[in-house]
UniProtKB/Swiss-Prot annotation:
PROSITE patterns named in the record: FAD_PCMH
Protein name from the UniProt record: UDP-N-acetylenolpyruvoylglucosamine reductase
Species per Swiss-Prot/TrEMBL record: Streptococcus pneumoniae serotype 19F (strain G54)
Role this protein plays: Cell wall formation.
Gene that produces this protein: murB
Catalytic activity field: UDP-N-acetyl-alpha-D-muramate + NADP(+) = UDP-N-acetyl-3-O-(1-carboxyvinyl)-alpha-D-glucosamine + NADPH + H(+)
One GO molecular-function entry: UDP-N-acetylmuramate dehydrogenase activity
UniProt-annotated catalytic positions: 173, 223, 293
GO cellular component, one term: cytosol
């Protein structure tokens, strides 16, 4: 029995799509095919997929809403798991519990409806709750670390554990999950009682700022660089004269230099080449080395063509 036949038998009932283009699920609108794109409906299906992948030695990864990710043009080998169907959100007093696939912006709106404050900073951050925890997403002085009470995860070995904020060792755009290989299942956020109108006014203000300053009208990978200590990445890029700088179909936004935008059917290679070129030019101009915030995943097109049969153990 081939691995694919075994997969269809053991993972029967789970939504698995073969050779699925990743660009349909990415904010960048680029990316090659995933060998197996999986949409588990609950944590039990997710655990089944992870267990099967581990047993068969098939690589796997979980993507949130792919808002701060570039999938290379050659695609991703193995399983790519999208958790957007794990999206339940509940409110208990001043606590919101959200599954990993819940939309982060919608979760902040649920907090607003219940007059809970503390989540306003995230009202315009695209992505999923799980992805936000993974990278300790933040904006306008707030971040996930400030409000996370606990986080339920599936370890890479298939065990379910509950972690505290301390366990997650949050840092700037970092959590311990990035090294552990665990998968976020659900998160509890500790908020505070507030006034609906005050919360709404703050969310409206932050949303307006984001619309004013960021190129939301174009596909992009979000904020491409982490903030260097004592500096702003966008300012360093602007000072080097790089606004409007373009490689292929991707260019540095004139509106916000920290964003690389897809203006003309750009490719993942265009994104990657532009980001690397910006890093080099900023280093040359200011002596400061920018660090990528966006994650780059998968294989280049040239590598994928060398192994046109896909992931070797998975005979199709």
């Amino acid at each position: 029995m081939s691995v694919r036949e075994k997969m269809l038998e053991i993972l029967e009932g789970i939504d698995i799509r073969f050779q699925e283009p990743x660009h349909s699920y990415s904010y960048t609108k680029v990316g090659g095919e995933a060998d197996y794109l999986v949409f588990p409906r609950n944590r039990f299906e997710l655990a089944r997929v992870v267990k099967f992948a581990n047993q068969e030695n098939i690589p796997w990864m979980v993507l949130g809403n792919a808002s701060n990710i570039i999938v290379r043009d050659g695609g991703i080998r193995g399983f790519v798991i999208l958790c957007d169907k794990l999206n339940n959100v509940s409110v208990d007093g001043y606590t919101i519990e959200a599954e990993a696939g819940a939309n982060l912006i919608e979760t902040t709106r649920i907090a607003l409806r219940h007059s809970l404050t503390g989540f306003e900073f995230a009202c315009g951050i695209p992505g999923s709750v799980g992805g936000a925890v993974f990278m300790n997403a933040g904006a306008y002085g707030g971040e996930i670390a400030h409000i996370l009470q606990s986080c339920k995860v599936l370890t890479k070995d298939g065990e379910i554990e509950t972690l505290s904020a301390k366990d997650l060792a949050f840092g700037y755009r970092h959590s311990a999950i990035q090294e552990s290989g665990a998968v976020v299942l659900s998160v509890k956020f500790a908020l505070a009682p507030g006034t609906h109108q005050v919360i709404k006014q703050e969310m409206d203000r932050l949303t307006h700022l984001r619309e004013l300053k960021q190129p939301l009208e174009y596909p992009s990978c979000g904020s491409x660089f982490k903030r260097p200590v004592g500096h702003f990445a966008x300012q360093l890029i602007s000072e080097x004269g790089l606004k409007g700088y373009r490689i292929g179909g991707v260019e540095v936004s004139e509106k916000h230099a920290g964003f690389m935008i897809n203006v003309a059917d750009g490719t993942a290679k265009d994104y990657e080449d532009l980001i690397q070129s910006v890093i080099e030019k900023v280093k040359e101009h200011s002596g400061i080395t920018l660090e990528r915030e966006v994650r780059i995943l998968g294989e280049s097109l040239s590598v994928a063509k060398m192994y046109a049969g896909g992931f070797t153990p998975c005979k199709r």
